[in-house]
Amino acid sequence: MAMDISLFFIFLVIYAPLVSYADESQAEIDALTAFKLNLHDPLGALTSWDPSTPAAPCDWRGVGCTNHRVTEIRLPRLQLSGRISDRISGLRMLRKLSLRSNSFNGTIPTSLAYCTRLLSVFLQYNSLSGKLPPAMRNLTSLEVFNVAGNRLSGEIPVGLPSSLQFLDISSNTFSGQIPSGLANLTQLQLLNLSYNQLTGEIPASLGNLQSLQYLWLDFNLLQGTLPSAISNCSSLVHLSASENEIGGVIPAAYGALPKLEVLSLSNNNFSGTVPFSLFCNTSLTIVQLGFNAFSDIVRPETTANCRTGLQVLDLQENRISGRFPLWLTNILSLKNLDVSGNLFSGEIPPDIGNLKRLEELKLANNSLTGEIPVEIKQCGSLDVLDFEGNSLKGQIPEFLGYMKALKVLSLGRNSFSGYVPSSMVNLQQLERLNLGENNLNGSFPVELMALTSLSELDLSGNRFSGAVPVSISNLSNLSFLNLSGNGFSGEIPASVGNLFKLTALDLSKQNMSGEVPVELSGLPNVQVIALQGNNFSGVVPEGFSSLVSLRYVNLSSNSFSGEIPQTFGFLRLLVSLSLSDNHISGSIPPEIGNCSALEVLELRSNRLMGHIPADLSRLPRLKVLDLGQNNLSGEIPPEISQSSSLNSLSLDHNHLSGVIPGSFSGLSNLTKMDLSVNNLTGEIPASLALISSNLVYFNVSSNNLKGEIPASLGSRINNTSEFSGNTELCGKPLNRRCESSTAEGKKKKRKMILMIVMAAIGAFLLSLFCCFYVYTLLKWRKKLKQQSTTGEKKRSPGRTSAGSRVRSSTSRSSTENGEPKLVMFNNKITLAETIEATRQFDEENVLSRTRYGLLFKANYNDGMVLSIRRLPNGSLLNENLFKKEAEVLGKVKHRNITVLRGYYAGPPDLRLLVYDYMPNGNLSTLLQEASHQDGHVLNWPMRHLIALGIARGLGFLHQSNMVHGDIKPQNVLFDADFEAHISDFGLDRLTIRSPSRSAVTANTIGTLGYVSPEATLSGEITRESDIYSFGIVLLEILTGKRPVMFTQDEDIVKWVKKQLQRGQVTELLEPGLLELDPESSEWEEFLLGIKVGLLCTATDPLDRPTMSDVVFMLEGCRVGPDVPSSADPTSQPSPA
């Protein structure tokens, strides 16, 4: 018996732990399985999470164990989405949880507080919402908690674990005050509360955090003053509270913090003096105090004992006055000094040459005088020298040309005179040169033609003369050229057309003449062309219509003639068009109404005639419309009132007739209206009194107006001259009383009563007529229905003739031997061969299913393989119309679209389309496979070629006046050479009866995640909606993120922008692109691709580029042998 009891206890000792271990392991497996079931896993990252594996769960991806218990979960950047399961509380031994950079949503589960052994939690850059759970206080071992970049809200909980060392809740929407209880986190080393909506003051109790090294409070709504107690944080290394509303002075004690390296307090309301202690700290290297209201810097009694390591000092845009602080020149460690936008006066001290490590010196927008001291040449490392907006004088020093490290030299808005020194030729690294608004003279400085790195050149507002040299084309990197306000003469050199990077060209207010060279129409990126105030002649350049990026055109005050080109209507991004003071004739082209971004249209003082086109009402953003001093006639179109943004309307000195439209009362933003010197008649509409009090100028003089001036209008406009020249006009402010107004009023009243009586009688007679008509119609329909019923009964024996009609139709579409044949553009294939090749349209041969039917793989006996699309039964398009549309569609050919090779149309309602077979599937499958193989199958060059191929194909469709309507990865197919082909285009033509193609029903506007916002709202597809869809596909190619992975509040576009704003560029990289070197050209090309994607997905359709622009940008994004030319748009040879 004793032996049995002993054996029993031995059994318990040996097997009880094993049973306990098995139970705990199973509980952890169950918890992780529940966690997985909550998630969407597009990359299949959790496929290894199988309970049947030998060491489950310790051999699962991302799961770490210690002594067979789960202690770590690491699943970053795997595109996981869904809620974090409450069952995670079953992992009682968990020490580290890392789910960062995914798409988790919902709230942080309260049950996480049961994982009491947690040391670190990384949940940053997800889409989590709600509040921080108060139960977090139970995580008594927690050291790191990072939830940055989510959508968390509410107040910061008071009871956070006192064990915390790193707390980052930045980039959320937390509100309320910073809790003083944070002072209890005595082990805290990093506290990041930036980019939230926190209010109130910074609690002084934070000064108790002796271990705190990093305190970031930027971009909140904090007020009050900086607490002096923060100076007790003796371990503080980085203190940043920029972009708040903090005021008062900076405590001098901050300068005594022994380890402080960075102090950033810019964009606040600080005032008073800057304490000198900040410049006497050996550890402090960066001080940023710009955009405040400081009035002075405390001047030291002596700097003998002052040692500092300061490298960056930013005091820009304050109110500091007096002479430049001489003692600053003793801070020999300075690399960046910015005191621009202050009130400094006097001369620049020669001692500034002591700062030999200086790389950036910005003294712009002060009141400095004198000459540039020669000692500055001792600062040999300077790459930015900005003295713009002062009162410096003398000649530009020759020695500046020998400071070869200079990249930015800005001396504009001073009083420099003389010539540009020839030594400038040595500044080969110079990128920006601003010498505008000085008194420089001579001819165009030819020395500048050697500065091939220049991207911006401003010589405006000087006294240069002579011709603009042809050699200006040497500046091939130039994007901004401003030569306005000089005395240049001669013609614009045609070589300017070679400056392909030019975005702004300003040659205004000169003595230039001749015609505008046609080469200017070949500048692909130009947005601004300003040629006003010269003597240019010839016709208005029609070639400008091809400059799709053009936003501002000013050709006023020249001698241009001819008509306004109708093709200007293609300039959809045009914001301002000014052609005033020329000799332009003809009529105003109604096509201008297509320039939907137009805000300013100035055509004054020309020879325009004809009517004012009502199409101008289609300009919703129009603010200034000036058509004065022309020969326009006809009535003022009342539709102009639809341009509700209009604030200035000038139609004076024309031959306009008719009345002033009463609808003008809807122009609530109008401040000026000039209708003087015309032939307008009638009264001034009383409704114009409804125009807001913003109206300060109203001129209707010299017309044929009559009646009383509306009282409220007359009291607001007191100048009699603005109503003069209208002999029958009376009332204020004119000195003419409206004496007959009472009698006329009675006459009008009697006339009104008579009209009301007549209208009532007419309405009664009309209602009688309608009743009689309806009665007659109903009686006629009843009789017709009886006749048709009788006829049907008589014809019923003939119903079987339908079969004979089908057979007859079949014989007409057969070959000579009677077998139906497919219409092929390059080959002969019979229907029987096709049915056999698809195995009777067997389910196993289905390649894809869309709303346009099934796509089958067809294997013919001769080895040829094609794709056959069978359109849905019941197609409403009749046979003849289907054939006509298919013939047209078969002529649409390009190397990057799936070309229609043939078709079949015959009874019973069978419609087939023949395409080349694409053996390498579609883009959606390819991206999914790439993610499973860590992306190595899709490197950067291949992704770029795919994107470029799609862009070329879509661009060709748009040039062919076709809109796709459903651009998505599933509709991008790949041939044997992995060339991209766009499929499923033009099929609406073959399935919709209506000849109108402009309106598309809501179920055909595209695919969720890829369809543009405006297409979703309007139900209409356009080129712009295609471009938006392409942008989404491009971002998916580059980032590997599928649009459907995101929540309703955040889409892929917002996600990409958020990562860029945070500087988290690596988060955008698809796993296969992680090997890109940030210093390589491929990295830059990738970023350019991202920018193209964001341009295509702009919220306003008018801000999106055309597909030809996209192709141009993508071709320029990667230049090399791996980018084939797009010059050959023809399709590739087909096996069919």
UniProtKB/Swiss-Prot annotation:
Enumerate the UniProt keywords alphabetically.
ATP-binding, Cell membrane, Glycoprotein, Kinase, Leucine-rich repeat, Membrane, Nucleotide-binding, Phosphoprotein, Receptor, Repeat, Serine/threonine-protein kinase, Signal, Transferase, Transmembrane, Transmembrane helix
Q: Which domain of life is it from?
A: Eukaryota
Q: How does it sit in the membrane?
A: Single-pass type I membrane protein
Q: Does the keyword Transmembrane apply?
A: yes
Entry's transmembrane regions: 752-772
Q: Where is the composition biased (Low complexity)?
A: 799-815
Q: Show the InterPro entries listed in the entry.
A: Kinase-like_dom_sf, Leu-rich_rpt, Leu-rich_rpt_typical-subtyp, LRR_dom_sf, LRR_N_plant-typ, Prot_kinase_dom, Ser-Thr/Tyr_kinase_cat_dom, Ser/Thr_kinase_AS
Query: SUPFAM superfamilies, per this entry?
Result: L domain-like, Protein kinase-like (PK-like)
Q: What is this protein called?
A: Probable LRR receptor-like serine/threonine-protein kinase At4g36180
